[in-house]
């Protein structure tokens, strides 16, 4: 039987995958930081298992530019699989409607 927490994580990963298909997602630490600096990012989602250096870079950049960064209990492999890629530590959402959907599930 699937726990409630696992259902919520699966729903979150599905929404991230949908954002990817809609072209509203940026993938990877460097690309996410560049998008934050460009003012496009509405929300950053990162794996809680990301390296300390990656977490620091994301947090510093997001905090400086006033972007919300959420760390979720998924592995980089799971996050990557949700978007059809290899392991990735973080993604950013560029669309306000997807942000509303995703934050209601965090």
Spans of features found by a protein language model:
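Small/polar loops that bind or transfer phosphate-bearing groups
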Residues: 46-47, 71, 90, 94
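N-terminal positively charged helical leader segments and presequences
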Residues: 37, 41-60, 66-68
């Amino acid at each position: 039987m699937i726990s409630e927490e696992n259902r919520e994580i699966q729903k979150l990963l599905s929404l991230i995958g949908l954002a990817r298909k809609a072209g509203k997602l940026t993938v990877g630490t460097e690309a996410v930081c560049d998008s934050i600096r460009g003012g496009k990012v509405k929300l950053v989602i990162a794996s809680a298992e990301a390296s300390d250096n990656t977490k620091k870079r994301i947090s510093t950049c997001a905090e400086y530019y006033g972007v919300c960064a959420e760390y979720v209990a998924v592995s980089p492999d799971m996050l990557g699989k949700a978007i059809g890629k290899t392991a990735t530590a973080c993604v950013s959402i560029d669309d306000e409607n997807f942000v509303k959907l995703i934050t209601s599930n965090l």
